[in-house]
């Protein structure tokens, strides 16, 4: 059984259960002659059980026959960090210059567990350090052990 020839990949961040033919989805898929309505329906069906509006990084694989498949990744670390810190946006200046909120080390560990499939490590401690680094670059202070 031969595999289909891949025409290209499209990387988008799409809100859960919120795929519409409007930009950026419509133009990105239209350029590659993909059935936009079919993608939107499939994506919305796949994300139906999730909280509406969560940003989901999605990799769409487009094949030569204009068919497609897609892989939904976990929401960005920044989404979880903002949720745990109860803030709407990160600091405009980075690191310790302007602290806009706090997260605990346990929060970072919990986020790391959720993000493990998409991080380039299998070690929970290394994943926690990655999340702590993201928190610091957003202007969040990590408290606790």
Swiss-Prot record:
Any GO CC annotation of this UniProt entry: cytosolic large ribosomal subunit
A GO term for molecular function: large ribosomal subunit rRNA binding
Keywords on record: Methylation, Ribonucleoprotein, Ribosomal protein, RNA-binding, rRNA-binding
Pfam family, one: Ribosomal_L11_N
Organism field: Rickettsia peacockii (strain Rustic)
Protein modification: One or more lysine residues are methylated.
Listed name of the protein: Large ribosomal subunit protein uL11
Phylogenetic placement of the source organism: Bacteria, Pseudomonadati, Pseudomonadota, Alphaproteobacteria, Rickettsiales
Protein family (similarity comment): Belongs to the universal ribosomal protein uL11 family.
